[in-house]
Amino acid sequence: MATFKAKARAVELLGKGQIADLPTAITELWKNGYDAYAKNLNCKLYLDSYKDNQSPVFLLSDDGFGMSETDINDKWFVLGTDSKARGEKINPAFGLKRRIPMGEKGIGRLSVSYLGPQMLMLTKKKGETANAFLMDWRILDNYNFFLEDLNIPLFAFDSVREFIKKLNESKNSFQTNLKSDNWKEQGKSK
């Protein structure tokens, strides 16, 4: 019996590789905010003079529903999800009318890789703790790496102090991807 496998670089091919330019990348991400019933979608660029940063910081934010840990694991990290196509129900407590979804294929979120080499996602669903994860898209440059071998630390937090502590732990944990046996010189196979 044969099965499909996906190299980690497939994420880059479906994300950054499918995006023509910066406005397209932002539009794809704003579609996700719209589909999350956001009333406000914001885009800000902080140049390298911002808080002693060595690189510019590009911030996209919305005030949509947010995601729980389950949502992140079962939707955000699952390529080609069909939750929008199935027309998931809106919690009536929000008092919102159903919107026609803008995103359709379940891969638009990957356009974030076009914006820069690293991404920090912070999200909070009403009534739940906040969640975050850090992704360094450069890890996908490893042609020997399979998606199932990629370790992306996801953590919950309730305070700024806890966030900073867990973010530092998350950075160290993400670096275990670099120690993997799969991280070899380009051109050499596993």
What do these predicted ranges mean?
Residues 1-190:
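GHKL (Bergerat-fold) ATPase N-terminal catalytic module, capturing the glycine-rich phosphate-binding loop
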